[in-house]
């Protein structure tokens, strides 16, 4: 099921501490961006709509310490099924409660997106 607009708007509110978030439809979900830079996505990988935050080598451990899931999906490579992953982690459960709780995670995600842009 495609992610709904209300959830996308709510996620943008949660991420508002880093600036005005724009939600755009993307591959059946949503891309959340600031100034054209995508730093979060919303997707349903089979267990409902979820907010996924951009992570990098510097921030990955912080997400994993809270047992956040890595964005992983089934795909094919050379005609064989494989699990593929992207540099996004599910938002911590507690952070989904308020923009104040989400603020440090929003900064991490935006920082990861900025770092990836410089590469």
Where are these regions (language model features)?
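N-terminal first-folded block
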Residues: 2-38
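Noncatalytic, solvent-exposed loop/strand surfaces
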Residues: 6, 50-52, 87-89
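Amphipathic alpha-helical interface surfaces
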Residues: 7, 11, 55, 59-62, ...
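Short, intrinsically disordered, mixed-charge
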Residues: 13, 57-69, 107-115
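Residue-level signal for pocket-adjacent positions within structured domains
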Residues: 21, 58, 86, 91
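Short, conserved beta-strand/beta-arch hydrophobic-aromatic motifs that form part
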Residues: 26, 32-78, 82
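Well-ordered alpha/beta subsegment
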Residues: 89-119
């Amino acid at each position: 099921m495609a992610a709904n607009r209300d959830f996308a708007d709510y996620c943008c509110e949660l991420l508002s501490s880093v600036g005005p978030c724009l939600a755009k439809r993307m591959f059946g979900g949503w891309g959340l961006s600031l100034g054209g830079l995508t730093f979060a996505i919303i997707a349903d990988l089979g267990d409902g709509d979820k907010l996924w935050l951009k992570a990098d080598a510097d921030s990955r451990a912080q997400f994993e310490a809270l047992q956040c899931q890595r964005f992983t999906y089934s795909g094919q490579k050379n005609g064989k099924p494989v699990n593929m992953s992207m540099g996004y982690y599910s938002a911590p459960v507690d952070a989904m409660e308020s923009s104040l709780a989400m603020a440090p995670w929003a900064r991490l995600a935006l920082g990861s997106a900025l770092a990836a842009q410089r590469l």
